[in-house]
Amino acid sequence: MNSTAAAINPNPNVIPFDDTYILYDSHDFLSFLSAYFSLMPILVLAFYLSWFIITRELEACIVAFGQLMNEIFNNVIKNIIKQPRPVSFGASFQNDTIRSGYGMPSAHSQFMGFCFTYNSLKIYTSWKNLNFLEKCIFSGALALLSFCVCFSRVYLHYHNLDQVIVGFSVGALTGSLYFFIVGIIRELGLINWFLKLRIVRLFYMTDSYNLAPLTLKENYEAYWKRINQRSFNDKSKRD
């Protein structure tokens, strides 16, 4: 049996891709569900990428860069504290990778703490077209999603409760600080200066999400306005 396995995978340096390699109890539905919630940070980053590709919004790059810096900061803290995880996942777990195998603070929880805080502040300060209740609903949805991710890390025994609480708290702190720094950069006019660079203009990048965020209804109405205007212009040319 062992010789067969060695023949299939003879390379001793092959290890699991830890970002998507999640162990769960196959007889426990909640454990199965928690495995999917543990993938949420990857899905969020995929959303940022697709958001930028489709809309060319600079905000997608700004928040993704902040999340990346937050992730690096998490690695630094882990290698300083060096607190082990509550359960060992084997010698190959995050061994010889750029990520730390330590448990304090939880990277997933810190990611969601940053995501929740930064985007909640954005909702309350920039989304002028929403009333207070609507803002609370959006922020509450982010809070619920963050809770599910944090819970999954404890339930799957990747972290203990303290590691998750500290991780989320550190993420919330860095998210708030990053939001403040981005605000200062905007006030200084550096965002507009960046968007006016020739190489940036080639990508048609904008900052409309910050200046004038639109609702789905406004986007829909603007779409039909363009369609009707185009039809009118075509008709005028034929006449």
From Swiss-Prot:
It is found in: Endoplasmic reticulum membrane. It catalyses: a di-trans,poly-cis-dolichyl diphosphate + H2O = a di-trans,poly-cis-dolichyl phosphate + phosphate + H(+). The keyword Ribosomal protein does not apply. InterPro entries: Dolichyldiphosphatase_PAP2, P_Acid_Pase_2/haloperoxi_sf, P_Acid_Pase_2/haloperoxidase. Pathway: Protein modification; protein glycosylation. One of its GO terms (biological process) is lipid biosynthetic process. Keywords: Endoplasmic reticulum, Hydrolase, Membrane, Transmembrane, Transmembrane helix. GO terms for molecular function: dolichyldiphosphatase activity; sphingosine-1-phosphate phosphatase activity. The chain crosses the membrane at residues 35-55, 132-152, 165-185. Residues 1-34, 153-164 are lumenal. Disruption phenotype: Causes an elevation in dolichyl diphosphate levels. It is an enzyme of class 3 (hydrolase). It holds the Pfam family PAP2. Its main location: endoplasmic reticulum. This is Dolichyldiphosphatase. It comes from Saccharomyces cerevisiae (strain ATCC 204508 / S288c) (Baker's yeast). The lineage of its organism: Eukaryota, Fungi, Dikarya, Ascomycota, Saccharomycotina. The gene is CAX4.
